Amino acid sequence: MARAITLVESTRPQHRALAQELLTELLPHSGRARRVGISGVPGVGKSTFIDALGVMLTSLGHRVAVLAVDPSSTRTGGSILGDKTRMERLSLD
């Protein structure tokens, strides 16, 4: 997943054709996903809420993916985080 994201975001000419090929293969499989954005100040309970919501959804038979981004990253403008430690119950499902 990380390699695919890097490839698609790359500005290198040699990556453009590969990124287009990847997106062409994935696009037919992308129509059924629901996307939800959660935002808030640090400490407000975003990870706790996502954990509880995710556990509820997986208990109903749904599949859940979490992509957590920190937009305050000065180097990248939005680093992708690994919040598995904050979403312990969901990481077990």
UniProtKB/Swiss-Prot annotation:
Entry superkingdom: Bacteria
GO molecular function: GTP binding; GTPase activity
InterPro entries listed in its UniProt record: GTPase_ArgK (IPR005129), P-loop_NTPase (IPR027417)
GO CC, any one term: cytoplasm
SUPFAM superfamilies: P-loop containing nucleoside triphosphate hydrolases
Sequence similarity: Belongs to the SIMIBI class G3E GTPase family. ArgK/MeaB subfamily.
Protein name: Uncharacterized protein in mutB 3'region
